[in-house]
A protein has these predicted regions:
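Active-site-adjacent betaalpha module
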Residues: 1-24, 50-58, 82, 86-218
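Short, contiguous, helix-prone interaction/anchoring segments in small proteins
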Residues: 22-54, 63
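Short beta-to-alpha linker loops that shape the active-site pocket of alpha/beta-hydrolase fold enzymes
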Residues: 31, 68, 177
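Short, active-site-adjacent cap segments at secondary-structure transitions
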Residues: 33, 69-73, 156
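Conserved protein kinase catalytic core
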Residues: 35, 72-73, 128, 182
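Von Willebrand factor
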Residues: 55-74
Length: 218
């Protein structure tokens, strides 16, 4: 691990970033109403579940993001415009709140049910950091890097990775445990992140092995 003049550790490799004292797992929007929209949703759920099991076994902190939508009467400009686009309606009166708090589609899928020791952060925007407690909680835990997986790459994972990097974290994208609503758009998002140098990249099997390895090394 390289150091700068101030002796700040700079993780450069996946192994360096996966320090159990300084890494967390962030599971992005694995909700019933989102997973059900993707043909490969069950496969993404399985891979995310494997990573989650390994992180729990290795003692890594786990956070979930969960998208919620306000009642239509309280939606802002962004929420209304996005809902009109995604719901393919032309009139504001026809917009429906897609993920109201407490609804079936808002819930985390049962196979990934959070434990009492894990946190779920609700949000109304795409980045898991914007307007939530996530940054505060990670810093309180001494976290410097986070591994991210879930749905959808091109909608919320990319902005979460970019904002996380702007906040000083080292994001690790678990590529094959990230699902995209539009595969081409998802690949473009990964390409943008690679070009920017914001993140490290891995797959579910590799990072799961590192998580399990932390169990034997502690």
């Amino acid at each position: 691990m390289e150091k700068r003049i101030s002796e700040l550790d700079i993780p450069r490799t996946l192994e360096e970033a996966c320090d159990p004292k300084h890494m967390a797992l962030l599971i992005y929007d694995m909700q019933v109403g989102i997973v059900d929209q993707l043909p490969h949703g069950p496969e993404i759920t399985r891979r995310v579940g494997n990573v989650l099991d390994a992180a729990r076994d290795g003692g890594f902190p786990v956070f979930f993001s969960r998208h919620m939508s306000l009642p239509t009467e309280l939606m802002g400009i962004f929420q209304i415009r996005q809902a009109m686009t995604w719901q393919q309606v032309d009139r504001i009166e026809d917009v429906k709140s897609p993920f109201p708090q407490g609804s079936a589609q808002w819930q985390i899928v049962p196979d990934l049910e959070p434990l009492p020791s894990e946190a779920v952060s609700d949000k109304i925007v795409m980045s898991a950091f914007e307007g939530t407690f996530l940054d505060f909680a990670l810093r309180d835990q001494g976290i410097r890097s986070f591994a991210i997986c879930g749905i959808a790459t091109e909608v919320g994972i990319e902005p979460t990775v970019r904002q996380g990097a702007d906040l000083g974290y080292v994001p690790v994208v678990i590529e094959d445990a990230c699902g995209a609503g539009d595969e081409a758009a998802g690949e473009r998002s990964l390409g943008v992140l690679r070009f920017a140098g914001d993140a490290l990249f891995t797959d579910a099997a590799t990072i799961s092995a590192l998580f399990y390895e932390a169990t034997t090394s502690t």
